[in-house]
């Protein structure tokens, strides 16, 4: 099973916020996830995010691949493999 760390869209139309989730790469964007590890709100200025660093590091060490956007969020949060 290929595991990805990616964003799950939440919120209303034209007012999105995202949850950072660990999910199977074959599941749909807003489908079933394995675990939620944070949130990201791009509508605020500046963008706001909260990440559980312990869970993020655990999943990265287990081989989960972050998407480009999540990798950028992790980099600004100081989370690396």
UniProtKB/Swiss-Prot annotation:
GO process terms (BP): translation
UniProt xrefs under SUPFAM superfamilies: Ribosomal protein S16 (SSF54565)
GO molecular function terms noted in the UniProt entry: structural constituent of ribosome
One GO CC annotation: cytoplasm
Pfam families: Ribosomal_S16
Membrane-crossing segments per the record: none
Keyword set, alphabetical order: Ribonucleoprotein, Ribosomal protein
HAMAP family given in the database record: Ribosomal_bS16
Family as reported in the entry's similarity comment: Belongs to the bacterial ribosomal protein bS16 family.
Record-given protein name: Small ribosomal subunit protein bS16
Classification lineage: Bacteria, Bacillati, Bacillota, Clostridia, Lachnospirales
